[in-house]
Amino acid sequence: DFGLDYQVSGRSTAAMAATDALGSLGQLQFDEFTASGSTVSAKLTEALDRDEVDWLLAERDFDEGVAILQTANSVAYGDNVLGYCQLLARSEIGYLFASVDGRLTFRDRNLSNTSLASFGGSGIPFQGISVETGSELLFSRVVVTREGGSATTAVTADAVAWRETNGPLRSLSITGVLLSNDTQSLDLAEYLLALYDSPRYRVRELTVQLEALSSTDQNTVLELDITDMVTVEFTPNDVGDAVVQFLVVQGIRHDITPASHVVTLSLMDAPSPFFRLDSADFGVLDTDILGL
């Protein structure tokens, strides 16, 4: 959309408002139907192919998915298209987003273990970095309940020791996912517990001043997308050894003015499937590399 603002001084301004694939899907609703398909990719394809959605094939990019979903779930008249697509992705803790080239994209939780950019050290310089060690992502118990199923629970092995180290026990509950059986629900609960049952010193956010970079580094930053993996090296207060973390991009923000272009990357820990035996970065035994 374009908005024009005319002033008596003769100075006029034009403002443009745009939305991405998620915003467009959020404005659409379904007719009633019974969904088929047993993977996230199959169900997303079925949903986007419907007449009331009619999403272009060229505007999608889907992983197959790692979970087996219910094959006959009901979608009600008026259900929001974006909400349903997000439910499908959440059912296996996958990622649904609009890519840098504008396509609706689904990535399952088994992400690539290739770092696409290195920040700090001898890599791309950054302007600022935010680190957290809080309890927001710290849980001793995870409960997953699928649609039509029973609650399945994964708990830390030693609750007493956990409480002594981390304080009061904390629970994470996920409900309404479309997994096909309770065994998969338990697998998901155990996956999340492994990810969140230990405190981590994590880089939460990193900012880069784009115009200060070489053209090669600028292109590297601009080509990054959600679910890409990056390496971050920094030395807190320039004291002690450098900290190196392997992180996944979960958000990208651009702040642009006539004199500045700042890119902010929101980051999260690389999930547990990044373990690779004998990998120099992800499978070094007898070190704490797996605890990054």
Which role fits each region the language model picked out?
Residues 5-136, 242:
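Charged- and aromatic-enriched interaction segments used to assemble
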